[in-house]
Curated annotation (Swiss-Prot):
Pfam families: ATP-synt_ab, ATP-synt_ab_N, ATP-synt_VA_C. This is ATP synthase subunit beta. It comes from Synechococcus sp. (strain RCC307). Produces ATP from ADP in the presence of a proton gradient across the membrane. The catalytic sites are hosted primarily by the beta subunits. Keywords: ATP synthesis, ATP-binding, CF(1), Hydrogen ion transport, Ion transport, Membrane, Nucleotide-binding, Thylakoid, Translocase, Transport.
Length: 488
């Protein structure tokens, strides 16, 4: 296969048709490029301006013609221009040199920091790891964030759906996860910006620099690589940038043998771009106008995100649900691959409970006794049932007041409010805003803390002592401080 690819490398074709981002190219007989090969088109347009673009072969049309999708704008492209077959798929830079950098779908830097300092590159199209190479035993990925580790734990090498609207703290949660995997697991992160707003991509980069996730003075100390294909890019770039980011993550897993976090924002835009390309290629649309290959496209991306015996890629994917319709084929296909969901709640955010992760709506396939153990499972279910009872009582409290509740219900409400407050915690990346030192809470400390609240051991402590702290020792210290201030 490699020999065949080399045989077509350098073969020159001629652009015969341009329809938006799709171009037809004619090659000499017997020298057609393979599907997914990259074509390079360079030259001058009619205005005398230089053009340089890369396109990916998608279809073999017959009559020595292929159809390709451009990875950048085709403005000024004219029929008769020369297209050169590179003989290989699009390849992107990989390794430590990518950390702290922003790259596009082709791995070219777009942050005005000079070239990416790495010699290693890897093709964006490759097979998922073999079954014999996979780590099949489920293992919890500890994040140090209490609400996630207790109620909706992440699977190492799993996929997590992140649901939340604007202003709920998605970005801060992502930054904290990047910080914690670097400090506690010695891992790195890759962020794939797929089809989202350019302004948001820029804001995220600036926030990463402010919080120390990207070290602007010494990029080698950065903890994340960024790969962007934003809303203004052609559909080809938005369709492939997720694979570019995944390829960078695979290098850290397979070569450096590290645990990697891969963020995809937004997985729906990946599907949307595939739908646009499918229509441009003339394929018959499927349900709701999506591409007929929807399941295959999503599966090829998701199956590469996994744990191997060498390392793991744990993926957190922001999921946009069009018109809040969970039965739409795009989110429905994505859900089939998810191991956990983290749902952010506007109600909790408005109460000042951060991270605003909804303890009742967030789910995980890992939360079962056989995986997390009986103690963890029972504690998590007890926390959820207490919060559920509190939710049911809120209407009664709003109409009649707290005094009309039975003694047992009042105790439940008191403990539930403490549990709700204890689910908050200060983040390392938010220290510059809150003035509070960040806290990484080990899972056993988290379980112990919630057990003590539910058993009634801490009924005499004030509710305020449970807000924005790490473990129970800090709750007791804060309660002591509140009491001494009240006496003083």
């Amino acid at each position: 296969m490699a020999a065949a690819a080399k045989a077509t490398s350098g073969t020159k074709g001629v652009v015969r048709q341009v329809i938006g981002p799709v171009l037809d190219v004619e090659f000499p007989a017997g020298k057609l490029p393979r599907i997914y090969n990259a074509l390079r088109i360079e030259g001058k347009n009619t205005a005398g301006q230089n053009i340089a673009l890369t396109a990916e072969v998608q279809q073999l049309l017959g009559d020595h013609r292929i159809r390709a999708v451009a990875m950048s704008g085709t403005d000024g492209l004219v029929r008769g221009m020369e297209a050169v077959d590179t003989g290989a798929p699009i390849s992107v830079p990989v390794g430590e040199g990518t950390l702290g950098r922003i790259m596009n779908v082709l791995g070219e830097p777009v942050d005005e920091q000079g070239p990416v300092k790495t010699d290693a590159t890897a093709p964006i199209h490759r097979s998922a790891p073999k079954l014999t190479d996979l780590e099949t035993k489920p293992k919890v990925f500890e994040t140090g964030i209490k609400v996630i580790d207790l109620l909706a734990p992440y699977r190492q090498g799993g996929k997590v759906g992140l649901f939340g609207g604007a202003g709920m703290g998605k970005t801060v949660l992502i930054q904290e996860l990047i910080n914690n995997i670097a400090k506690e697991h010695g891992g790195v992160s890759v962020f794939g910006g797929v089809g989202e707003r350019t302004r948001e991509g820029n804001d995220l980069y600036e926030e990463f620099k402010d919080s120390g996730v990207i070290n602007a003075d010494d990029l080698s100390k950065s903890k994340v690589a960024l790969c962007y294909g934003q809303m203004n890019e052609p559909p080809g770039a938005r369709m492939r940038v997720g694979l570019s980011a995944l390829t960078m993550a695979e290098h850290f897993r397979d070569v450096n043998k590290q645990d990697v976090l891969l963020f995809v924002d937004n997985i729906f835009r990946f599907v949307q771009a595939g739908s646009e390309v499918s229509a441009l290629l003339g394929r018959m649309p499927s349900a709701v106008g999506y591409q007929p290959t929807l399941g295959t496209d999503v599966g090829e991306l998701q199956e590469r995100i996994t744990s191997t015996l060498e390392g793991s890629i744990t993926s957190i994917q922001a999921v946009y649900v069009p018109a809040d319709d969970l039965t739409d084929p795009a989110p429905a296909t994505t859900f089939a691959h998810l191991d956990a969901t983290t749902v952010l709640s506007r109600g909790l955010a408005s109460k000042g409970i951060y991270p605003a992760v909804d303890p009742l709506d967030s789910t995980s396939t890992m939360l079962q006794p056989a995986v997390v153990g009986d103690e963890h499972y029972k504690t998590a279910r007890a926390v959820q049932s207490t919060l559920q009872r509190y939710k049911e009582l809120q209407d009664i409290i709003a109409i009649l007041g707290l005094d009309e509740l039975s003694e047992d219900d009042r105790l439940t409400v008191d403990r539930a409010r403490k549990v709700e407050k204890f689910l908050s915690q200060p983040f390392f990346v938010a220290e510059i805003f809150t003035g509070m030192p960040g806290q990484y809470v080990k899972l056993d400390e988290t379980i112990k803390g919630f057990q003590m609240i539910l058993s009634g051991e801490l009924d005499d402590l004030p509710e305020a002592a449970f807000y924005l702290v790490g473990n129970i020792d800090q709750v007791k210290a804060k309660a002591e401080k509140i009491r001494s201030e009240a006496k003083g």
